[in-house]
Amino acid sequence: MQRNLVVLLFLGMVALSSCGFREKHFQRFVKYAVPESTLRTVLQTVVHKVGKTQFGCPAYQGYCDDHCQDIEKKEGFCHGFKCKCGIPMGF
C-alpha cells in the first residue's frame, strides 16, 4: 500500500511540474503528506534531483540555446541533463 502511495505521489508531482509548480512547492507537500521517516528523506532527495534536471535538454536540441538566450543572452550547451550557458562541451 505504501509503495502505491509513493508511486502515485511521484507521478502526481511529475504531472504538476509541467504546470509550473516549483521544487519548493513539492518539498512542502512531501513534508506534510509523508510522515517523518527514511521514506520522506528519500522522496525529498528525489524531488530535489528531479527539480535540478532539465528534461528538455537531451530530447530537444535547441532547448538549451533557447533557455540560455532567455536568461543570460549566451549560447547554451547540453551537459547530460543540465544546460550550461556559455560553457561548451569539454570533449
From Swiss-Prot:
Keyword Transmembrane helix: no
Major place of residence: secreted
Signal peptide segment: 1-19
Family according to the record: Belongs to the long chain scorpion toxin family. Class 1 subfamily.
Domain BetaSPN-type CS-alpha/beta: start-end pairs: 54-91
Main function: Has a low affinity binding to potassium channels of rat brain synaptosomes. Displays weak antibacterial activity against Stenotrophomonas sp. Strongly inhibits the development of the Plasmodium berghei ookinetes. Displays slight hemolytic effect on mouse erythrocytes. Induces cytolysis on Xenopus oocytes at high concentrations. Is not toxic towards mice and towards the insect Tenebrio molitor.
Pfam families: Scorpion_toxin_alpha-beta (PF14866)
GO molecular function, one term: toxin activity
GO biological process, one term: killing of cells of another organism
Domain of life, per lineage: Eukaryota
Expression across tissues: Expressed by the venom gland.
Keyword Mitochondrion among UniProt keywords: no
Xref: PROSITE patterns: BSPN_CSAB
Keywords: Antibiotic, Antimicrobial, Cytolysis, Disulfide bond, Hemolysis, Ion channel impairing toxin, Potassium channel impairing toxin, Secreted, Signal, Toxin
Cysteine pairs bridged by disulfides in the record: C57-C78, C64-C83, C68-C85
One Gene Ontology CC term in the entry: extracellular region
Localization per Swiss-Prot or TrEMBL: Secreted
Name of protein: Potassium channel toxin MeuTXK-beta-1
InterPro entries xref list: Long_scorpion_toxin_alpha/beta (IPR029237)
